[in-house]
């Protein structure tokens, strides 16, 4: 599972200006798909009660909600991609390309692993791969967060989200467990 998440995340980080995750599929779809020209959300193991309403809302707004093969949403799909429709096919192609390069193992049944242990493994994998400083607050056992400052100003864009490009990844109810990349000092000429 870690390899899949790392492959997906690496693929999006190659092409994305920013990456945000609130921990709620419905909230992400409503907020992020209205803001961007090519916004995308992909989610693993979504329950049908989390997706049913957003399927209607997104479709009525002109967006798309499909599985990783481009099949329109129906109850029981394990992985979903939501977008405002502009770059939906490109997102699907990116995910297919990234996932074809990763050897994926099929596991029968469900693997029991505490979410806290999974969060620690994921944070450590990010720390190791991207050389990002790791911070862990033990009071938050159901969350991880990656922040990384990227390039700055997007002229002519009314959205304040583009003025400081931030890469964020959040999961869970509590955002005390996090990984941050130290900011580079400003160099003067």
UniProtKB/Swiss-Prot annotation:
<dbReference type="InterPro" id="IPR036324">
    <property type="entry name" value="Mn/Fe_SOD_N_sf"/>
</dbReference>
<dbReference type="GO" id="GO:0007165">
    <property type="term" value="P:signal transduction"/>
</dbReference>
<dbReference type="Pfam" id="PF00459">
    <property type="entry name" value="Inositol_P"/>
</dbReference>
<dbReference type="GO" id="GO:0006020">
    <property type="term" value="P:inositol metabolic process"/>
</dbReference>
<protein>
    <recommendedName>
        <fullName>Uncharacterized 22 kDa protein in trpE 5'region</fullName>
    </recommendedName>
</protein>
<comment type="similarity">
    <text>Belongs to the inositol monophosphatase superfamily.</text>
</comment>
<dbReference type="InterPro" id="IPR000760">
    <property type="entry name" value="Inositol_monophosphatase-like"/>
</dbReference>
<dbReference type="GO" id="GO:0008934">
    <property type="term" value="F:inositol monophosphate 1-phosphatase activity"/>
</dbReference>
